[in-house]
Amino acid sequence: MIPGELFPADGEILLNAERAQIALVVSNAGDRPVQVGSHYHFAETNPALEFDREAARGMRLDIPAGTAVRFEPGQTREVRLVSYAGSREVYGFNGRIMGKL
């Protein structure tokens, strides 16, 4: 084995295949860009982002871990969200949940 060498499985790897997913249209009504990371509780994002926050409760962006989506001022785009797994507890972020979903 060589340090850093990868041994990927054959076939396609599907991320979040078993989790509930939705698509939402999101608009940045602010005057500055807003960037949202892969595991941020989407319902608690910057208030300049306009979308159905109740629909986004308990969900995060359906993108690879460690990546982010950037919303430029005035930009509208559709994003896919995926539900949190595990104990479905949310702490921190903007402090709106602080416990079970």
UniProtKB/Swiss-Prot annotation:
Keywords for the protein's UniProt record, in alphabetical order: Cytoplasm, Hydrolase
GO biological process, one term: urea catabolic process
PANTHER family listed in its UniProt record: UREASE
Subunit-structure text: Heterotrimer of UreA (gamma), UreB (beta) and UreC (alpha) subunits. Three heterotrimers associate to form the active enzyme.
Similarity comment text for this entry: Belongs to the urease beta subunit family.
NCBIfam families: PRK13203.1, urease_beta
Protein's name in the database: Urease subunit beta
Species per Swiss-Prot/TrEMBL record: Cereibacter sphaeroides (strain KD131 / KCTC 12085)
Encoding gene per record: ureB
